[in-house]
Amino acid sequence: MIDDILLESEERMTSSVEHAREDLTTIRTGRANPSMFNGVVAEYYGVPTPITQMATISVPEPRMLLIKPYEQSTMDAIENAIRNSDLGVNPTNDGQVLRVTIPQLTEERRKEMVKVAKSKGEDAKIAIRNIRRKGMEQLGKIQKDGEAGEDEVRAAEKDLEKITHSYVEQVDSLVEAKEKELLEV
């Protein structure tokens, strides 16, 4: 029972760290990164579809992305979706492919993005702490119900605390890496 609680808590914490990692990849850094288009959706035969499923996205140069639609008929929809997104980029259409040049970030914009990264990291740490709190409540309940002894529960609480600490450190290192990437000129 105690092992199940610890295992479930750890799985949920892993999921929170992965979610944070995905959130942080969507933050624009001034470098070309295909994952920045993960949240961009275009109309495809009347159905909202992620553009990552409608085209191949490559990085021919450090600050340029090349988007080649699988179907030429979707070119305008993809172009409009990128233009209307909040990414702040403007694609150029040469008939075959879309070229997206990533503008250099200003110092002010970099600092804003660092704040966004820290905020996303803090959200992930809050989620991890909430998972810990729920695990602690479950441990307290099984002790109260007499399913486990006080010593077992106390040891499990220490283990849960160690697990939580390691996942919070993982989030901190992700945010630190993103911050370093953002402030690099």
From Swiss-Prot:
Keyword annotations: Cytoplasm, Protein biosynthesis
Instruction: Give Gene Ontology CC terms.
Output: cytoplasm
Indicate the principal place this protein occupies in or around the cell.
cytoplasm
Q: Which Pfam families match?
A: RRF
InterPro entries cross-referenced by the UniProt entry: Ribosome_recyc_fac, Ribosome_recyc_fac_dom, RRF_sf
Q: List the disulfide bonds.
A: none
Give compartment(s): Cytoplasm
Tell me the GO BP annotations in alphabetical order: translational termination
Known Gene3D superfamilies for this protein?
3.30.1360.40, Ribosome-recycling factor
Q: Name one GO molecular function term.
A: ribosomal large subunit binding
Top-level taxon of the source organism = Bacteria
Q: Which family does it belong to?
A: Belongs to the RRF family.
- Matching NCBIfam families: frr
Q: Which PANTHER family match?
A: MITOCHONDRIAL RIBOSOME RECYCLING FACTOR PSEUDO 1, RIBOSOME RECYCLING FACTOR
Give the protein's function: Responsible for the release of ribosomes from messenger RNA at the termination of protein biosynthesis. May increase the efficiency of translation by recycling ribosomes from one round of translation to another.
Identification of the protein by name: Ribosome-recycling factor
Organism of this sequence: Corynebacterium jeikeium (strain K411)
